[in-house]
Amino acid sequence: MNIYTNNVNNANVCNNANRGFVRALILLVAAAATIGTAYGGVPLNNLQGTGGIAFNPLAYTAGRPWEGGETNILNGIVSKPQVGGWYVNLTDADINWFALGAAFTVADRLEISGGYAGINAHNYGDNSLNTYNIGAKLRFLDENAFETSWVPALAVGGVFKYTDSETVDALGLRHHGADGYVVASKLVKETPIPVLLSVGGLVSDEVVYGVVGHNRYGAAVFANIDIIPFEQIALGFEYKQGVRVGDGITNHDYFDGHVAWFVNKQLTLVGAYAYTGDKDRFYRDGHTDRLGVGGGFVLSLQYQF
């Protein structure tokens, strides 16, 4: 396979899609700014659909309660759904990545999520790469449990993942895999500015976030920190350690800095810059350690019903 195949037509399609996405985002921002005075928040639907930020899950479960409180029979049984869309433009590698996710929570404890991503990596010979995810997360300890102000929310979860791509076969990897994780999250309100802290451990077989396939299992850690200087704004940093997945393959650490605007109680907009490692490390040097796909800008639109 020629890993540096250029496809001008696909590049033009991506450019048109990029412009359409930005136009739609501007229209939604303008419309949302005219309604609502209450503000949404985390968790968002991350790139795999799980309730979290961008790469990482949070211990909080997705979905708002229904109106009517205890008089609504759905409350305590199933939450409202929430959805999120992502556009990732990894300019270093000329990769365009669109992701959609949805999630809801059962019995105020068990989050069920799903996600899809379509990725165009035409410079690497793969114009149509698709990933599919199904996740579940159980929050087994509530934030501030035992009448305290310091206990974090704790959750365990997993994501089953499938990658549909010729690249998987070309690299001798598996199409399917799974993640398992445990995560603790805490909103600290005693500081001058509220701070959201989250840290967790991950077991995964992913190669480049599962985008190019799956191999053997390894362990890693992840963390998030966000400050909330204004009721409608959060500024944060996200870290995800690269997993060693056998056969000399190690993923690069992932980083992103982001800003979230809670437009109203339903709509949240996110802008970020993400870095995933040297895009040419394997193709230039033949190394399979610290694999990445470069860096670029990220936009997200999240909606909580």
Regions found by a protein language model. Name each.
Residues M1, V8, P152, V195-V199:
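Low-complexity, intrinsically disordered short segments enriched for Gly/Pro and polybasic residues
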Residues D247, D280-G292:
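Solvent-exposed loop segments that connect transmembrane elements
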